[in-house]
């Protein structure tokens, strides 16, 4: 019997870690492909906005937000090591999941979505997203230079969740040159994605030699608007000159008698 239903869409990176821990814990989930903009009543029960991922358990328990769902599914195994060993580990897991969900992914989307034609292109917005992404991964690179994984020295839910989101960067932008400049992030990503718990459910991505997604798609050729034909203008007629005013009769001279 299924533990519950997960509303998502194919290759949704916020759902990858949920699927991974469910499989690792032998938890069966009904995966429902949510139609964008047409959420079912059951889907809306889990998330009133109709967003994904969303979860409804067989017991009726409804839950939205990817981090909450991932932790809930992971915690069904009381002996799991994916949530860390200490309270500090657990807090650190939440920290990294929140960082990748609220900082990393939105900027990656703002970078690749306009270039794919999925949203309107604005050069300033894309440039800002590129800068933010580089800044975010500079933080991750610095941390992973001194740590094998994001929390402690073994893989946790934070790594599964973060690697799924980082996949979008490696899929579209993190080419050979970028990887050479971020060896720690690259090593970590390769390590996590090679783990069966991740690879059995995650989207398969080929590492890039060079970036190809660099320009927005060309706008479809639009038929040229016909030039408006100017109406033939008739030559302006000069107005006729006004008649000169009549001159008043001259007054008689002072020494002449007035007419009777």
What are these regions (language model features)?
Residues 202-226:
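Intrinsically disordered, low-complexity mixed-charge segments
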């Amino acid at each position: 019997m299924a533990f519950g239903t997960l509303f998502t869409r194919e290759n949704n990176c916020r759902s990858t870690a949920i699927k991974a821990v469910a499989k690792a814990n032998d938890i069966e989930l009904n995966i429902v492909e949510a139609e964008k903009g047409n959420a079912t009543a059951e889907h809306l029960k889990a998330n009133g906005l109709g967003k994904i991922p969303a979860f409804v358990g067989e017991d009726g328990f409804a839950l939205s937000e990817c981090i909450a769902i991932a932790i809930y599914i992971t915690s069904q195994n009381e002996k799991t090591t994916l949530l860390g060993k200490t309270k500090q580990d657990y807090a650190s897991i939440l920290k990294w999941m929140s960082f990748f969900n609220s900082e990393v992914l939105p900027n990656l989307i703002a970078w690749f979505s306009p270039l794919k034609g999925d949203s309107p292109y604005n050069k300033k917005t894309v440039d800002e997203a590129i800068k933010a992404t580089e800044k975010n991964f500079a933080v991750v690179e610095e941390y992973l230079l001194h740590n094998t994984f994001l929390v402690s020295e073994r893989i946790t839910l934070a790594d599964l969740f973060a690697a799924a989101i980082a996949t979008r960067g490696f899929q579209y932008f993190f080419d050979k040159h970028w990887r050479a400049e971020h060896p720690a992030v690259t090593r970590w990503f390769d390590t996590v994605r090679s783990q069966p718990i991740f690879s059995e459910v995650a989207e398969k991505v080929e590492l890039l030699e060079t970036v190809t997604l660099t320009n927005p798609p060309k706008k479809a050729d639009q038929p040229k608007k016909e030039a408006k034909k100017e109406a033939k203008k008739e030559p302006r007629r000069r107005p006729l000159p006004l008649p000169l005013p009549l001159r008043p009769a001259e007054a008689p001279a002072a020494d002449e008698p007035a007419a009777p």
